Amino acid sequence: MVKVYAPASSANMSVGFDVLGAAVTPVDGTLLGDNVTVEAAEQFSLHNLGRFASKLPTAPQENIVYQCWESFCQEIGKTVPVTMTLEKNMPIGSGLGSSACSVVAALVAMNEFCGKPLNETRMLALMGEMEGRISGSIHYDNVAPCYLGGMQLMIEENGIISQQVPGFDEWLWVLAYPGIKVSTAEARAILPAQYRRQDCIAHGRHLAGFIHACYTRQPQLAAKLMKDVIAEPYRTKLLPGFSEARQATMEIGAQACGISGSGPTLFALCDKPDTAQRVADWLGAHYLQNQEGFVHICRLDTAGARVVG
């Protein structure tokens, strides 16, 4: 039996649309992510557990974990009969890499169970393919940090899919999920087909400056450059209360604030625990819309997916 935990992730980070992502873990020890268990069996079966299991497809073939098992078996050239259990702790359509959690946990669990026949690069490529089935396009900004941990920059050249960017230990990520769903496909459809030249220049300046600031250990500069001219101006209309929340968190003292992935989760970056707590309290009182919503104060999850049983 193998049990694998895969952490939540925040893609884009305002400054890196489709090319940056960070794995996150709550500072209070709460597990914000999915678990997948694989056990030997005579034939395949899949069981769903967890807080958000009721939101999953009822037909096993439509479940991404089943599709991961099927693709993994094709990849290694043999059918491996197993019982898989998905513990779905991540809300679907939240902007926290929910589908990536399931994909990464399922594939890592299968790879561990079978004695690691696939290397890291092939695993990551397969994860991107599986993620693409849900979002409509292959992208790695959730699966890469979820799998490898830390802050990841998508490279996709010279056989390299992603590489780690140094983060800052003092950064606290306040993540507020309001409890509503925004589909990745819908959030992508709202974006323009073409961008103005000045926006392209600003985006390049912000992203290059951010990576430079990370490597030269300038946290305040890095946070200041976390601006989004590509997606946020258009996606804000999908997120009730986002503009007000952003203004409030910055006034409280957040270093940066933006949309996590395609939303509706908001992230606010703080460099002091008391600031993070005040931001979390405000978001809990004003940004959450129902009982399914939550706020977590997080740090970077540097471990990524790991075997927990």
From Swiss-Prot:
Keywords: Amino-acid biosynthesis, ATP-binding, Cytoplasm, Kinase, Nucleotide-binding, Threonine biosynthesis, Transferase
One Gene Ontology CC term in the entry: cytoplasm
Subcellular location: Cytoplasm
Chemical reaction(s) catalysed: L-homoserine + ATP = O-phospho-L-homoserine + ADP + H(+)
SUPFAM superfamilies, sorted: GHMP Kinase, C-terminal domain, Ribosomal protein S5 domain 2-like
Xref: Pfam families: GHMP_kinases_C, GHMP_kinases_N
Coiled coil residues, start to end: none
Biological process annotations from GO: threonine biosynthetic process
Positions of ATP binding: 91-101
Pathway of action: Amino-acid biosynthesis; L-threonine biosynthesis; L-threonine from L-aspartate: step 4/5
UniProt keyword annotation of Transferase present: yes
EC code: 2.7.1.39
EC main group: transferase
UniProt superkingdom: Bacteria
A molecular function GO annotation: ATP binding
Family: Belongs to the GHMP kinase family. Homoserine kinase subfamily.
PANTHER family xref list: HOMOSERINE KINASE, HOMOSERINE/4-DIPHOSPHOCYTIDYL-2-C-METHYL-D-ERYTHRITOL KINASE
Entry function: Catalyzes the ATP-dependent phosphorylation of L-homoserine to L-homoserine phosphate.
Descriptive protein name: Homoserine kinase
Organism: Klebsiella pneumoniae (strain 342)
Name of the gene this protein is made from: thrB
